[in-house]
Design a protein with these regions (language model features):
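Long, highly charged amphipathic alpha-helices
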Residues: 1, 48-52, 215, 219
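Helical scaffold of the NTase/Pol beta-like nucleotidyltransferase catalytic core
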Residues: 1-14, 44-46, 227
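Catalytic metal-binding acidic patch
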Residues: 15-52, 65-70
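Short, solvent-exposed loop/turn segments at secondary-structure junctions
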Residues: 20, 75, 164-167
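Conserved NTP/Mg2+-binding pocket subregion across the NTase superfamily
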Residues: 51-152
Length: 227
């Protein structure tokens, strides 16, 4: 559909996240797509393309929906903390909306993830298009992600997010939630992590102890601060 809509202006399309890392579950995962176009699109073109990508027009197999960003080649190489985007969605109403000059602070983390683990749907390797994000910047970004999880996500997600951040800080690798927890268990993480991992593998709801979660997250955050 993107090739049909953009033609030669479509430079690259990349699948990332759980679907690229082997931990995809349609009941709880979203589908993460990063697309790159040659130049900014006009207002009418953005509106038409956004409508074609919305939930009503493009049913998504993942219950959690679509995480989609369209950026220009210039934005893909932009060292800013929040590079500008052409389109982003889905929002809470299943819409894909134009950026209108706004930036997205999640994009540099997506650049790093896509460069390392993304799957090419269309175009050249992601390393040819997306800027290389230094590891210290990546660690700062996953620290922000962990802080967001503490305030907004379930306790089990906090644990899994902490495991992934810990792994990245040690060896620079991005992992799925499952692989991050397995890595942490192998390195002597508290029993809490093995319990959350077992529930994750079985697709069960997990209700770890709040105090144990807070202590584990704090310990990982301390590791991140000293990197």
């Amino acid at each position: 559909m993107l090739r049909d809509a953009l033609g030669p202006a479509l430079i690259g399309v990349y699948l990332h996240g759980s679907a690229a890392l082997g931990d995809y579950d349609p009941a709880r995962s979203d589908i993460d797509i990063l697309a790159v176009c040659a130049a900014p699109l006009g207002t009418e073109e953005l509106a038409r393309l956004g409508a074609r990508l919305g939930r009503d027009a493009l049913p998504c197999p993942a219950d959690a929906g679509l995480e989609f960003s369209l950026i220009t080649v210039a934005a893909a190489r932009d060292p800013a903390a929040a590079p500008p985007f052409e389109l982003h969605g889905w929002d809470e109403h299943g819409r894909v909306l134009p950026g209108e000059g706004r930036g997205d602070p999640d994009l540099p983390r997506h650049f790093a993830v896509v460069r390392q683990t993304g799957l090419v749907i269309h175009g050249p390797p992601a390393t040819d298009i997306l800027r290389d994000v230094p590891l210290d910047e990546q660690i700062a970004l996953v620290t922000d992600e962990l802080d967001w999880a503490v305030g907004n996500a379930s306790r089990s997600t906090q644990v899994l997010t902490a495991c992934r951040a810990w792994g990245l800080s040690v060896d620079g690798r991005y992992r799925s939630k499952r692989d991050g927890a397995e890595w942490a268990v192998e390195r002597g993480a508290p029993a809490l992590v093995a319990e959350v991992l077992a529930d994750h593998r079985a697709a069960r709801e997990s209700h770890p102890d709040a105090g144990a979660v807070a202590a584990f997250v704090a310990s990982v955050r301390t590791r991140l601060q000293h990197k």
